[in-house]
Amino acid sequence: MLNIVIFGAPGSGKGTQSERIVEKYGINHISTGDVLRAEIKNGTELGKTAKGYIDQGQLIPDELMVDILASVFDSFKDSKGVIFDGFPRTIPQAEALKVMLKERGQDISVMLDLDVPEEELMTRLIKRGKESGRADDNEETIKKRLVVYNTQTSPLKEYYKGEGKYQHINGLGTMEGIFEDICKAVDTL
């Protein structure tokens, strides 16, 4: 199976590029953001708990996310692979994901890091918030999310470099140009 972690700060284009990867490679997309938004919309207990963290710009506790992902991953047993979008966000999550996949005879194939400067991220996220009405795309929450990303999530780059799975992708440019760079990285696996 082709198991990809797509990585980058909020607003780096993970969702957009994930859709293109899914279409080209015929793999399934697991977006923790979409899963969590569905839980919140449906008013589940997990959704209510998650909403409290999201509204404060904080990360969801690992044990909640790993359980959700294991269930979703297991529903794709006959798949060519999956792309993990929005997970892992910390080294303990990466280690938990590795264990969860190993228990299923799988591993991460590659981690794609969509690298975008912070000023551009702010511009993209403020625009997205205005267009979509997403509550977590206001300036104050965006700044908190970027601080969390830089302190808690960014160390994953070194983790995946150590695993030999890291691929840097320049997240500036056209969607097509960025996707070409992604395909070059994936096609060499």
Swiss-Prot record:
MF annotations from Gene Ontology: adenylate kinase activity; ATP binding
GO cellular component, one term: cytoplasm
Keywords per UniProt: ATP-binding, Cytoplasm, Kinase, Nucleotide biosynthesis, Nucleotide-binding, Transferase
Subcellular location per the Swiss-Prot or TrEMBL entry: Cytoplasm
Amino-acid positions noted as binding AMP in the UniProt annotation, renumbered to this chain: T32, R37, Q58, L59, I60, G86, F87, P88, R89, Q93, R134, R145
Region (NMP), start-end ranges: 31-60
Region ranges (LID): 127-137
Oligomeric form and interacting partners: Monomer.
Domain notes: Consists of three domains, a large central CORE domain and two small peripheral domains, NMPbind and LID, which undergo movements during catalysis. The LID domain closes over the site of phosphoryl transfer upon ATP binding. Assembling and dissambling the active center during each catalytic cycle provides an effective means to prevent ATP hydrolysis.
Name of the protein this chain belongs to: Adenylate kinase
Listed NCBIfam families: PRK00279.1-3 (NF001381), PRK14527.1 (NF011100), PRK14528.1 (NF011101), PRK14531.1 (NF011104), PRK14532.1 (NF011105)
Pfam family, one: ADK
Family affiliation: Belongs to the adenylate kinase family.
InterPro entries linked: Adenylat/UMP-CMP_kin (IPR000850), Adenylat_kinase_CS (IPR033690), P-loop_NTPase (IPR027417)
Organism of provenance: Bacteroides fragilis (strain ATCC 25285 / DSM 2151 / CCUG 4856 / JCM 11019 / LMG 10263 / NCTC 9343 / Onslow / VPI 2553 / EN-2)
Reactions it catalyzes: AMP + ATP = 2 ADP
Summary of the function given for this chain in its UniProt record: Catalyzes the reversible transfer of the terminal phosphate group between ATP and AMP. Plays an important role in cellular energy homeostasis and in adenine nucleotide metabolism.
Pathway(s) served: Purine metabolism; AMP biosynthesis via salvage pathway; AMP from ADP: step 1/1
Positions bound to ATP: G11, S12, G13, K14, G15, T16, R128, G173
GO BP terms: AMP salvage
EC assignment: 2.7.4.3
